[in-house]
């Protein structure tokens, strides 16, 4: 099995090395194409207004001066001799659950792989109020292949991406794997921080504020809070089917 690895944290991110370890439990035909620099929060962006350059960093590995989607596109169209059988994106530094999925570069890369006809899985390591750099990567290492192998044994719809999140607990404290739906937080966690430079001009940092929600049972958030690995099937169709029917019936033509 030929596996393409990518991420949004960049070619030198520790999570990419973790992902490579996970992938080697499944195959020895591993290829890597990841952004040259961190691209967190870039969502499904592709570079249309400037050229994208690649830098070879290994026998089957490239750093791409673009977005996660750029990396997947170039790998599959130009850098690899044949299409991959599987795209793995991650392991992201921090969870990609609930509303995060809409702007996650990690999930976007997997979505792009799916769009190209390749089964794709996004993987993220939750980070609940830890100091930066102190993630429990051992949990991802221990549970990564355990989550991926059963998925590979089944056929899932071509328009579906699997979203895997590992809880912020030690490997031995993981309570198992749960199949979940996407949840929604009951509090906004994205915040802005206004500051002033030496010339008196305002500038802003955008980031996350650590807040716990009270998520419903069966959601990705609840699974992570409760110490489970969460697996959620996501798809690119954003149509709200129930309201589509209502809108059609109530629309005045």
UniProtKB/Swiss-Prot annotation:
A single cellular component GO annotation: cytoplasm
Keywords, comma-separated and alphabetical: Cytoplasm, Hydrolase, Metal-binding, Nucleotide-binding
Functional note: Nucleotidase that shows phosphatase activity on nucleoside 5'-monophosphates.
Single GO molecular function: nucleotide binding
Enzyme class: hydrolase
Gene this chain is encoded by: surE
Needed co-factor(s): a divalent metal cation
One Pfam family of this chain: SurE
Annotated Gene3D superfamilies: Survival protein SurE-like phosphatase/nucleotidase
UniProt subcellular location: Cytoplasm
Catalytic reaction equation(s): a ribonucleoside 5'-phosphate + H2O = a ribonucleoside + phosphate
Family according to the record: Belongs to the SurE nucleotidase family.
Highest taxon above the source species: Bacteria
Binding site for a divalent metal cation: 8-9, 40, 92
Cofactor stoichiometry and binding remark: Binds 1 divalent metal cation per subunit.
EC number: 3.1.3.5
Name by which UniProt lists this protein: 5'-nucleotidase SurE
């Amino acid at each position: 099995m030929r596996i393409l690895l990518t991420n949004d944290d960049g070619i030198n991110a520790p999570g990419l090395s973790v992902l490579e370890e996970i992938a080697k439990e499944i195959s020895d035909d591993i290829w890597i194409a990841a952004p040259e620099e961190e691209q967190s929060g870039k969502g499904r962006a592709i570079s249309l207004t400037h050229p994208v350059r690649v830098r070879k960093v290994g026998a089957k590995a490239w750093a791409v001066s673009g977005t996660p989607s750029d990396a997947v596109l170039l790998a599959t169209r130009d850098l690899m001799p044949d299409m991959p059988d599987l795209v793995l994106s991650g392991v992201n530094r921090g969870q990609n659950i609930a509303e995060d999925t809409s702007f996650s570069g990690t999930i976007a890369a997997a979505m792009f792989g799916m769009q190209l006809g390749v089964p794709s899985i996004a993987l993220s390591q939750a980070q609940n109020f830890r100091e930066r750099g102190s993630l429990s990567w051992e949990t991802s290492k221990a549970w990564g292949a355990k989550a991926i192998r059963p998925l590979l044994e089944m056929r899932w719809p071509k328009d579906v991406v699997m979203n895997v999140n590992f809880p912020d607990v030690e490997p031995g404290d993981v309570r198992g794997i749960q199949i979940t739906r996407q949840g929604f937080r009951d509090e906004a966690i994205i915040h802005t921080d206004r500051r002033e430079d030496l010339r008196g001009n305002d500038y802003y940092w955008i980031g996350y504020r650590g807040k716990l929600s009270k998520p419903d049972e069966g959601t990705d958030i609840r699974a992570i809070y409760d110490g489970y690995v969460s697996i959620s099937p996501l798809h690119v169709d954003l149509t709200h089917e129930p309201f589509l029917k209502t809108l059609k019936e109530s629309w005045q033509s």
